[in-house]
Every structure is written in C-alpha cells, then in structure tokens.
Swiss-Prot record:
PROSITE patterns associated with the record: RIBOSOMAL_L24
Function: One of two assembly initiator proteins, it binds directly to the 5'-end of the 23S rRNA, where it nucleates assembly of the 50S subunit.
Taxonomic placement: Bacteria, Bacillati, Chloroflexota, Dehalococcoidia, Dehalococcoidales
Key words of the record: Ribonucleoprotein, Ribosomal protein, RNA-binding, rRNA-binding
GO biological process: translation
Cited SUPFAM superfamilies: Translation proteins SH3-like domain (SSF50104)
Similarity comment text for this entry: Belongs to the universal ribosomal protein uL24 family.
Subunit and interaction comment: Part of the 50S ribosomal subunit.
Pfam family, any one: KOW
One CC-aspect GO term: ribosome
Name used for this protein in its record: Large ribosomal subunit protein uL24
Amino acid sequence: MRLKKNDNVLVIAGKDKGKTGKVRYAYPRTDRVLVEGVNMIKRHSRAKGQAKQAGIIEREAPLHVSNLMLLCSKCNKPARIGSRELADGKSVRYCKSCNEVID
C-alpha cells in the first residue's frame, strides 16, 4: 500500500469526492485508510451505566485506497506515486508528475 499515516490525500470517488484530509490510520491488509473528516458515519450507542451516555456518535469510516490520491507537497496537486530505490538501497516514494521524492 502506498499511502501512509499523516499523508494528505484527495478523495476522487464516492460521496465525499473532492474533499481533502490527512490519513489518520492505515489498514494494509484490507487496503483501506481512515481520513480525518471524510466518510463520516453515524453510530448509535447504548448507555453503559453512569459512565457512558446513550446517543448518536459521528465518526470516520475507512475508505479504500483506490478512491484516494496523494496530494504532492511540492507541486500541490493530486499525483500518482511510484517507488524507486536510492543509491544507498533505501526505497522511497516519488511523485510521478514532478519527479520529486516524497519521503
């Protein structure tokens, strides 16, 4: 999976198309990520004694990575990303449009 925690992404498909946010958590096994403020769902919770109140809670749901594009920090555009190996053997991600190393 090419998206990591704290990446800025743009939603390119679905009900939140056009929104941007930061990746809060990545689920590599299912190719999904949790993005701040995007794909909000409502959960109904029951009261558990005096500690937890009953009510409707809004929270983010994971999105599939195919519906997201990384926002390049150099060219400030949504970009396809690739990976390449540096001379020292370290693998890094790079923006395919401006050819800059992302991390």
